[in-house]
Amino acid sequence: MNTNKRQILADTARRLFHQHGFAAVSVDRICREAAVSRPTFYKYFNGKSAIVQAVVVEQKNRVRAELEAVLAQCGTLESIADTFWRLQRESFAELYSAAFLRDMTDNTDLALERFFSELNEEKHVFLHGFFHTLQQRGLIRPDIPAELVGLFVRHADILAEQAQTLPRYSAEPQRLPQDILGLLLHGLAGEAV
């Protein structure tokens, strides 16, 4: 199997999903724009849901690798926060457009719903370990248990899906995760009361 064609399909899907969201993009369109046949598509992916998942996992793995690298470098909280901001901007520019985020919210595909839920849980486990390490290094306030930070992140995700929150961000859905990240990072860097 030619993994180059798989990557061409994934790159094309990422671009189209960013431009239009994944709901509006068909397998036919991905194949047409990638100049790859449908049988070739199905060698690598068993449908649109599978390529959505592959593209999201690829993005997640890249972000996680960079966060693990910055953690290994024992940087300052400021450099770590800068990395978070940069990765968030890159993710918005590469995949998580307003259209893509709306499709995630409006998704009715059970396989994708389960996938996004599992991905979210995996994110929380990773971030718990990440913030625990920062706390052990003295980079975030020692008086706040890492478990509380984890609960804050979980509740921030819930807040992001609340009907009361969504209208405020309907014109700029990417702004909500930015505001949540800003609140989290600036709150962690503050002095104890």
Predicted region positions:
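C-terminal effector-binding regulatory domain of bacterial HTH transcription factors
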Residues: G187-V193
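Short secondary-structure transition hinges
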Residues: R89-H128
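Alpha-helical DNA-contacting segments of helix-turn-helix folds
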Residues: I51-Q59
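Hydrophobic/aromatic-rich alpha-helical bundle segments in the mid-to-C-terminal region
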Residues: R102-D106, Q135-L181, V193
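Hydrophobic alpha-helical connector segments
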Residues: A54, E68-E94, G150-V153
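Short hydrophobic/aromatic patch on the recognition helix
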Residues: A35-F45
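Basic, helix-initiating cap at the start of DNA-binding domains
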Residues: M1-H20, A24-E33, A50
